[in-house]
Amino acid sequence: MSAKPQIAAFPKGWIKDLVAPDKLSIYEWIDMAGAMEIPGLEMYNNFHDFKDPANWPKIRRYVEAAGMTIPMMCCSPDFTIPDPELRQQQVDHEIHSIRMSAELGAKLCRVLSG
């Protein structure tokens, strides 16, 4: 028997605040999402609190302590950049994002087009 689909929340309305330093911390958003009583949180790779890899295990533990998981990481690299060096930077950042996804326990790393 396969697992039933689960619901995960994505903070669409708070992306700008979660990307900016000193606006909304990932921990504050996790607490807000916990009130929805959902099993999962979809994350975005450019949230400010994800910049330091030392934060990844702490964030994962915080999510799990709240009774949730991170089933998917959302990323938006731009592989269409004509300049080879800049395009390689995007590839390298995506590799970094895949590593971050694994560290956070995400089973999927979704790549948005662009």
Residue ranges, per PLM feature:
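Flexible, glycine-rich active-site loops centered on histidine and acidic residues
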Residues: L112-G114
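N-terminal pre-domain/capping segments
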Residues: M1-L108
